[in-house]
Amino acid sequence: KAGKQKVRFQYFEDCYKENAFLAEDIRQTVQNGVPLSEIAVLFRTNMQPRALMEYMVSANLAFQTKDRIPDIYEHWIARDFFTYIRIAQGSDSRADFLSIMNRPKRYIGRDSLPDETVCFDEWMKLYEEQPWIAERIEKLWYDLKHLSRLSPYAAINYIRRGIGYDDYLAEYAEYRNANKEDFYEVADEILASAKGYRTFEEWFAHIEEYRQELKRLAQEKRRNQNAVTFATLHSAKGLEFTKVYLIDVNEGVMPYKKAVLKQDVEEERRLFYVGMTRAKESLTICSVKKMRGKEVELSRFIKEAGKEP
């Protein structure tokens, strides 16, 4: 059966190019008479399809999910970014300041903000005896002023590198005995999402539309509807589709980065085979050269299957 389908391999510069191709190719496939319900996009982890799903929402292509896709904009890292942006746009809410004032560490005490609203001048006066903290508050004021003039992508970048939020993530990861790369991955996803939007209004409107779609998907669980199926390789077992796309077939994703032992890699190889054999007629395997701005290697499974570009 694996021998019968038409297999093609696509190699992209990055995930943006990959997603643009997928949305357009799915549209073409439907124009050629294949119903949406006979098309599937398969992936290794439920974090992967966010950008493509946002693309599908914008392109007005219906899809359903076999797995619960986490809302990345609900993540505490995203909430911190949005809080910085809210304050930069004029919020003086004590709650907003409390949530980010020590991310990164500025050694500012919570009791320095007794009122419901924050006034920078009064705040700095409180620390006249500790000028090094007053300086940090002043720097925060300058950072927020600068932030208010940036595009969404530049703003997230500045929060991470200019303000030092990535340093906070590294410290927090160490404190929690977690891997900082996992936190950076979330931050990278949010940064990638902001790309291409000139204003916060545009970006936030897009986020809202996507979140509504996620909610609707969760409520409706629209099965057997005419919609493209999005599924992890685990959830795809036993299903078959006329046309299948396997996305992000790169080292670190497929096989997954946590698969180190021989038997774990073997299980990943089996999953890859599961993905390949879901296609009745046409299989497209997609890989990228760069993911979240970093160079990534082609998956060893592609080489083993003799599908190298």
PLM region descriptions:
Residues 1-62, 89-90:
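Helicase P-loop NTPase motor core
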Residues 10, 64-66, 231:
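General small-molecule cofactor/ligand-binding pocket signal
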Residues 14, 44, 69, 233-236, ...:
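Structured loop/turn residues at secondary-structure junctions
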Residues 17, 50-51, 73-76, 239, ...:
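Residues that form or flank phosphate/diphosphate-binding pockets in enzymes
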Residues 35, 53-54, 82-308:
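Conserved helicase C-terminal RecA-like lobe
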Residues 42-101:
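Long, highly charged, low-complexity intrinsically disordered interaction regions
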Residues 60-61, 307-309:
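Structural alpha-beta junctions
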